[in-house]
Amino acid sequence: MRPRSRAGDKFMSQGQELCHEYFQLTAPCEKQPCIDMCSSKYKTGKGVCGPAVHQCFCTFSCTV
């Protein structure tokens, strides 16, 4: 399994009901591992690759 993220390379922002977290990966993002990483870390997490090649972008509910 490829490394998920490097320490210090992620940040969180909070909107009204949804939060977001970027993971800076050491390898190019792949769709299914990104989805799995977000859903395993956050109960309501949805993952997509991008906007950069080495990023996984997670969106999840802040209220859960």
Curated annotation (Swiss-Prot):
Alphabetical UniProt keywords: Antimicrobial, Disulfide bond, Fungicide, Plant defense
Disulphide connectivity of cysteines: C19-C62, C29-C49, C34-C56, C38-C58
Signal peptide annotation: none
Keyword Disulfide bond included in the entry's annotation: yes
A biological process term (GO) from this entry: killing of cells of another organism
Annotated family: Belongs to the DEFL family.
Record protein name field: Defensin-like protein 123
Pfam families for the chain: SLR1-BP
